[in-house]
Amino acid sequence: MFLSELYRYPVKSGQAQRLQASPVGLLGLQGDRRWMVVEEENGRFLTQRAWPRLGQIKASDDDSGQLLLEAPGQAPLRVPVPPADDALRGVTIWRDTLRVPDAGDAAAAWLSQLLGKAVRLVHCPEQRARYLPNGYGFNSDRAAFPDGFPLLLINQGSLKELDRRIGRPMEVLRFRPNLVVQGAEPFAEDGWKRIRIGSLEFRVLKPSVRCIFTTIDPVTGERSEDREPMATLRTFREKEGDVLFGQNLAVDGSGWLEVGMKVEILE
């Protein structure tokens, strides 16, 4: 079994960035979901669930370490990383509230024009990251702006089984993974507790609960009329009302991940 694909999402709900290699640490892959768009009025986070145009945002790091934002019909914008303790803004992501630095008026204007709504862009420095949901992980674990956990793993074998049941292929990016592994039986990951990739050990914390987000085509931004893959997932991956696909992870320590690395099951 090996690591076959590696992705990060610099802006929450923005486009994926496929990687060949990446540093990984406390908050997951370097630069993953460290930026988030929030309502200007109340600091509430926005996602593609309600704001599909977020999916048009292509974000990357430029040579100077600034965030480069691109979207159809808009001039590219470079956004400096704000100081960790400056221009703090109260924001809400699900049940969590935190104070994080605002990225400034230029980024806010660029995003507000794209979305047709008054919004701000915020950044999560490591020292302002969130605790994980109650009951999961260690007290030392943290997450930036993912829904709850620093890393998400998808097993390619499970995706192929889902494709077989649906009758057509589903893009892996519908599930917003960070790590994709190849060479395991379908849903073998349900039984994993600890894995090793390269020299790093990862704890498998809980299955990922899926939602309507997965019905959005990552290329076109349109929802599938037949509600796939959720419709099929509900027939065999529903537990106590939750639809489960993929596993949430946390890493012990920090290091380097590269596509092709061997994946070992430790427990």
Q: Where on the chain are the PLM-derived regions?
A:
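Metal-cofactor-dependent catalytic cores
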Residues: 1-267
